UniProtKB/Swiss-Prot annotation:
Keywords: Cell membrane, Membrane, Transmembrane, Transmembrane helix
GO CC annotations, alphabetized: plasma membrane
Protein's UniProt keywords contain Ribosomal protein: no
Record-given protein name: Uncharacterized protein YjiH
Entry-linked InterPro entries: Gate_dom
Organism: Escherichia coli (strain K12)
Regions crossing the membrane: 17-37, 79-99, 112-132, 181-201
Topology of the protein relative to the lipid bilayer: Multi-pass membrane protein
Compartments it resides in: Cell membrane
Main location: membrane
Amino acid sequence: MTQQGDAVAGELATEKVGIKGYLAFFLTIIFFSGVFSGTDSWWRVFDFSVLNGSFGQLPGANGATTSFRGAGGAGAKDGFLFALELAPSVILSLGIISITDGLGGLRAAQQLMTPVLKPLLGIPGICSLALIANLQNTDAAAGMTKELAQEGEITERDKVIFAAYQTSGSAIITNYFSSGVAVFAFLGTSVIVPLAVILVFKFVGANILRVWLNFEERRNPTQGAQA
């Protein structure tokens, strides 16, 4: 599996990328980064969360509103509605990534970001778009990572390390500046400091798992080779 992932990474790293590919890569980073989410101008359309939108609310008693999932659900039926709620963001993100790939953006990501992500996390640069997406949306990044794994562009080891990065503080920007607003007035430091701490420990957590995997691979060389 490792040899297959390295072979694919090598092909992407040596394949020539035109200006169109680099432009697609940078535009996709901007799209998933959330930099335009707070503006009221027309360029809000270049933000993932804006295009993803939101479901309407159903009117209830006494002026209250609920989502289409309703309230008090349980079991498989409520789980089905929850999964249905996640579908639009996953479909949209995978569609954007397919367009980016068709324009050569993933090859550009591999060539530009591998020298950065390999030392930091031990994963190839092709993961960079999912890494950026994870800052704003949990499901989009997970879907993109699954697609990379299924296409053999990342190894099982890469997937495990990357999942550790994503699980810790997932959708940090969206959650921090929505739910976190309630405690901003009580912070004894700058608003950006807790955000930076969370981001740093996303990398710390992934590297702790990375060290553990290295230890296990040295202890069981045959098992590490199969991964």
